Amino acid sequence: MENNDIQFTSLQMRTDKYGWASIQYANKKQAILYTRNGGVEWDVVNPLNSIVLFAYPINARSSWAYGLTKTNDDLLPAIFYTVNRGERWSEFILPVEEDWEKSTDVQVQLHATNMDSIWIVLSRKLASNKFEHNLYYLKTKGKVWKVIKNISISDSISGITFINDLIGFISLQKHYETSTVFKTINGGESWHPIKDIPSLEGINNGTTMAYKAIYKNNLLVIPTKMNDDIFLMNYSFDKGNSWHISNETINTSKVAVSFFSSYYGWVINSENGGVYQIIKKGAKWIKVSSNPLLKNVFCLHFFNRRKGWACNKKEIFTTKDRGITWKKVVYKINNIDKLV
């Protein structure tokens, strides 16, 4: 199998040496990759006897993954977890009740900040073009599950983020007549649209996408792409009770976003390779470079104030000077035939 047959779906380096990536093969099979030498070599570290659908790294050693586990000739939805760089995985079987949740076609969103608990949303598109979503919450100690069936959102979910056990946010891709963000204050039991998120004057109704909310040190950020190909950010400093709109916007239809902390963030305009550093808790955007190498990047992850990584479907790039200069990483994937 050649690298030409695969494409990256995510990349998260956690140190100079160690990091995770996800790839998809032409036959739609997916794999979790791990590197120990700065992205030069990658190993396939999928859980045994599984079909992986979504990976969610936590740190240099630990990661969650969602997929189907093969049990007695049956495929059961499961959450997998590793604390030793993918060498061994353990699993929890989801308490699903509906057949569609056991499919590889299910849409998946995950959120976790540690290895103690995780949120899972399973979604499907109905014939009416609306969506059905089931929410699962797992506390690993005691294997405690909370299940909320058919939550009251009918649009396509682009991300879920919880800032504590009770307060969470779901971001949507939808027609911009009502809110693109929903909030819960009771652990997901009920969800309500946030109606006071500011927008730009003169924006026409159309399809708007709110990206997965980012929460860093009491700064809550919701990156948003308007239908007129205008990218902006909404900020909250009080857990989503009040909101502010970014002073800056970018005219683009494609971006990659990363926040290392509440004080340092980055945006790449994936149409032209422009790199912006965000400081002062979102108040100031500084264009630090423009690099055609970065056209079409969709994943971006900074693990400190200076060092970051980005990828497009085929290539990996890294910076050591807060995004001013970027270098392409020549890589190889070992045992890639495991995907067949």
Locations of regions flagged by a protein language model:
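Extracellular glycan-interacting surfaces
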Residues: M1-V340
